[in-house]
Amino acid sequence: NDHRKFLCKDQVLRVESTSTAWTSGFEAGQEISIVLKNQDGQYVADAKTLEALEAEGRVVFRYVGFNPNGSRNDIAGITNERGNVVGLMPHPEHATEPGFGPSSSGFGSVSLRGGADGLGVFTSVLSNLINAR
């Protein structure tokens, strides 16, 4: 990343595409909060690749408000052409249980309503697997 320091923080992402197996349970434009744990890495690509990804709707998550690692175009996650593989920097697996993930109720408080925004990634793929039978 562009600062070479370990970050562990709640991160707001915008769902850019719901056409993948991993994002079909979200709404396009929905903002979710999941955990970012990152020291190494950022999304980099040349202008032609970025243009193609954007035109093809293959950017699936984008950082909102704060780009923690200097990723080009604020990209937090992309998908392959088929939409069955998603690469994502933040960690949705750390935001799957109410009261343990990021909370919209503020620092130091426990909210049983917050903290599970990452669960949508896994329920999306589970739903797609069940429907593929």
Kindly label every feature range from the protein language model.
Residues 1-133:
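Amide-donor transfer/coupling interface in amidating biosynthetic enzymes
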